[in-house]
Amino acid sequence: MPFDFRRFDIYRKVPKDLTQPTYTGAIISICCCLFITFLFLSELTGFIANEIVNELYVDDPDKDSGGKIDVTLNVTLPNLPCEVVGLDIQDEMGRHEVGHIDNSMKIPINNAYGCRFEGLFSINKVPGNFHVSTHSAIAQPANPDMRHIIHKLSFGNTLQVDNIHGAFNALGGADKLASKALESHDYVLKIVPTVYEDLNGKQQFSYQYTVANKAYVAYSHTGRVVPAIWFRYDLSPITVKYTERRQPMYRFITTVCAIIGGTFTVAGILDSFIFTASEAWKKIQLGKMQ
C-alpha cells in the first residue's frame, strides 16, 4: 500500500453539507474581520513610523569641533541705539573680547532709537559668559535701557527633525520689556550636548540648554549704573542621544500572526459557546432536555 502523504494534514476539511451556517456566526465573523483589520492597520502604522529612543552617557560627542561651539543670538533692544550696543565675550581660558563684530549685524529700529542685534559667533567649551552691553561704546549713554526681547539663542547646529521637541531655543520669545530700564539681566545657562542619529547612522550634533534668570541693578566702580544682558554658561558632562529605530520585520510578522490567530481562536470559542447554548435552549423549549 503506497504511503499517503496527506496523513500529515492537520487541517482536515469538513464537507460543506456537514456544516451549519448561523446568523450568530455571521455576525461574529464580520466583527472578527473588522477587529483584525483595525489591529492590523494600527500595527502597520506603528511599523512604518520611526521610534525615537533616547539615552544618556558621559562623553563629548562632537570631538571634531575643535573645542568650539557656534552660538546664534538674535535680540531686540527697542530703547538703545545701535551705535552703543556691543557684544563682549570672555571665558576661563583667558578670552576677553570687547565689542565682538565678526558675523554680527545691528539693525536700527524705532527711528534709530532702538536696535536689533543678530550675531553668529563661537565660544570655547569651558565655562564663561557673553553679554550685550554698552562697554565697547566710545561715549557711554547716560541712561542705558536694557529692556529687551530675545528672539533666538541657540548653540550648535539646528537639528533638521520634527519629532524632537527639546530645549534648543529655551530663551526664544523671552520678553523683558516690562522690566525696569536700568536693570541688568543675568541668564545662567546649563548647556547639554545632544546627538541625533537617524536610521542610516548619520549623526547630527547640537546643544540643548536649561536657563535660570534674575534681574538686578549693577554699579561700576565710579558709582554709575551699568546695565547689561548677561549669558553665563557652563557645559554639562552628560550627553543626550536620540536614535531613530524601526520595528524589525520579524516582530511585525509575529504580532500580525498573533492578532489573526488569537482573534479567530477567541471568536471560534465564543461562537461555539453561543451555538451550544442556543441548541440547549431549543431542546429545553421542545422538552427534550432532561
From Swiss-Prot:
Carbohydrate-modified residues: 74
A Pfam family reported for this protein in Swiss-Prot or TrEMBL: COPIIcoated_ERV
Transmembrane segments: 27-47, 255-275
Recorded GO CC terms: COPII-coated ER to Golgi transport vesicle; endoplasmic reticulum; endoplasmic reticulum membrane; endoplasmic reticulum-Golgi intermediate compartment membrane; Golgi membrane
Membrane topology label: Multi-pass membrane protein
Protein's cellular compartments: Endoplasmic reticulum membrane; Endoplasmic reticulum-Golgi intermediate compartment membrane; Golgi apparatus membrane
Chief location of this protein within or outside the cell: endoplasmic reticulum
The keyword Endoplasmic reticulum appears for this protein: yes
Regions of this protein lying in the Cytoplasmic compartment: 1-26, 276-290
Lumenal side: 48-254
Key words of the record: Endoplasmic reticulum, ER-Golgi transport, Glycoprotein, Golgi apparatus, Membrane, Transmembrane, Transmembrane helix, Transport
GO biological process terms held by the UniProt record: endoplasmic reticulum to Golgi vesicle-mediated transport; retrograde vesicle-mediated transport, Golgi to endoplasmic reticulum
PANTHER family reported in the protein's UniProt record: ENDOPLASMIC RETICULUM-GOLGI INTERMEDIATE COMPARTMENT PROTEIN, ENDOPLASMIC RETICULUM-GOLGI INTERMEDIATE COMPARTMENT PROTEIN 1
Family: Belongs to the ERGIC family.
Stated role: Possible role in transport between endoplasmic reticulum and Golgi.
Name of the protein described by the UniProt record: Endoplasmic reticulum-Golgi intermediate compartment protein 1
Recorded name of the encoding gene: ergic1
